[in-house]
């Protein structure tokens, strides 16, 4: 379980394929505090640490995970949002996030709002409306509030702190980068 409050931006330093699995090695200041078997959210995807040292750690994504998330599109040097698993007694500053991605969406527009930004996302319309206005949504692991909701998309507002401390800044509108979407548990 996670909160959607990003602790660090990690850098993918190695991608290694083994059959249908993908081993990702991530450099992060969190690495020295991690242990094998711990859960870490990578762009909202819950993955288990399988190896670690003081500077980096490795996780493995299976085919099912790669098919349903944006992890398959990562390259060496990619920036990923990271959050360690929630511990009993920790503050819940964001919202309850499972780390099981509902679907991949696409950023289709960014509007500057004089010091903040509105990001517009679209997703598979056959799923219907998976968000509600003023409800919570997780985009690439970041806990956000839905500003506008429609049948195949939604908008969120990004404050300067979130822009600076997450990988929202590198989302390139022209590249239509895939983003991991997870709607709030209580929306179901």
Language model features by range: what are they?
Residues 1-188:
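Conserved loop->alpha-helix
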